Regions:
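Proteolytic processing hotspots in large secreted/extracellular or virion-associated proteins
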Residues: 90-95, 103-104, 127-171, 222-228
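N-terminal non-catalytic regions of secreted/periplasmic and cell-surface proteins
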Residues: 207-241
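Short proline/glycine-enriched turn/loop motifs at strand-loop junctions of beta-rich domains
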Residues: 113, 123-127, 135, 163-167, ...
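Long, low-complexity serine/threonine/glycine- and acidic-rich segments characteristic of extracellular
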Residues: 1-88, 191-196, 237-304
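Short edge beta-strand/loop segments characteristic of extracellular beta-sandwich folds
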Residues: 121, 156-160, 231-239
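Proteolytic-maturation and junctional protease-sensitive modules
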Residues: 146-204, 245-247, 253-256
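Proline-centered linker/hinge motifs at extracellular inter-domain junctions
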Residues: 101, 109, 210-214
Length: 304
């Protein structure tokens, strides 16, 4: 068969998970392309398919498997792999670890235990799968993240045991890395039920955040002249649920600020022309994803 990567539909993008060895990609951060077409892979890039690329090898045959790769400029590389058929006394079948949490890929499936529930719509997984799931306290250890998910899966938490005030500061997080640090995931709150939608397996849990964001001036100080500055720069940070929004004004007028997510900085350019007074009162309000808020105020002077 052949693969022609000139173009493919945006709606097909997620199916690229079936074109590569996804488990290898997640474990080693390197993409290995499959030279056969797995089930539930409707990508339109495949041409001249014969037996979906699968080979029938017997002990009576030897042949050469040829791979030809070319780029858009016509450069070409050829790899030839000799294959010799060989008879084995027995072939050990692949071990399939069974669990109580079986998902038929063609059917919607739901699990619920200890106040946590999971809904998996039909065709969310690419193939029938036994999931490894553990419900521990306010956490769900939800399979392994080297298994791809095609459609959003919903995870729900019953938070009835928490007071309405405590619920305001709770959010759903995914734990990541060696130290299992919490990372905020979009949390939908309705009464005593919190839900999130995800296309990544992993550990999900409830986390409390009562600490407000931090704001610090970077290139100016309170009640100082900054006539030579071309910008106002501030550092904003939230170590809990993460920053949801920010708002900055000078003398009560809204000013445009650019947020650099990687550096955690807010920058306003004086070229915008909003700051026209000599004495200026800056106010910056930063709010995190559970409503904790910090207000930063400073006065600066500037010749115009």
């Amino acid at each position: 068969f052949s693969i022609q990567m000139d173009r493919f539909s945006f709606s097909e993008t997620r199916y690229l998970n079936r074109m590569i060895d996804y488990e290898y990609f997640k474990d080693y951060k390197s993409r290995v392309q499959m030279l056969f077409v797995q089930e539930n892979n409707p990508l339109s890039v495949y041409k001249n398919l014969e037996n979906n690329g699968y080979l029938s090898i017997t002990d009576e045959h030897s042949f050469t498997y040829t791979i030809i790769v070319s780029d858009f400029s016509g450069n070409e590389r050829i790899v030839r792999i000799p294959i010799e058929g060989e008879t084995y006394a027995s072939i050990k079948p692949k071990d399939i670890k069974t669990t109580p949490y079986f998902v038929d890929a063609d059917e919607a499936t739901a699990f619920e235990e200890k106040g946590i529930d999971v809904y998996i719509p039909s065709n969310a997984l690419y193939e029938d799968t036994y999931l490894n799931i553990k419900f521990v306290g306010d956490s769900i250890h939800f399979h392994e993240d080297n298994t791809p998910i095609h459609k959003n899966i919903t995870i729900g938490f019953d938070v009835e045991k928490y007071s309405p005030e405590d619920r305001k500061k709770l959010y759903i997080a995914r734990l990541y890395g060696y130290y299992k640090n919490p990372s905020y995931v979009s949390t939908y709150k309705k009464g005593a039920r919190f839900t999130t939608k995800t296309r990544t397996f992993g550990i999900y849990t409830l986390v409390e955040d009562t600490i407000a964001p931090e704001i610090k001036a970077l290139n100016f100080s309170n009640e100082k002249w900054i006539s030579n500055n071309t910008t106002l720069r501030l550092k904003i940070e939230d170590k809990g649920s993460g920053i949801k929004n920010y708002h900055a004004t000078v003398n009560g007028k809204y000013i445009l600020t650019e947020y650099n997510y990687k550096k955690g900085t807010l920058t306003h350019s004086f070229e915008d022309g909003v700051v026209t007074e000599t004495e200026n009162k800056l106010q910056v309000i930063v709010t995190d994803n559970v409503g904790n808020s910090t207000t930063f105020e400073s006065t600066f002077f500037r010749k115009n």
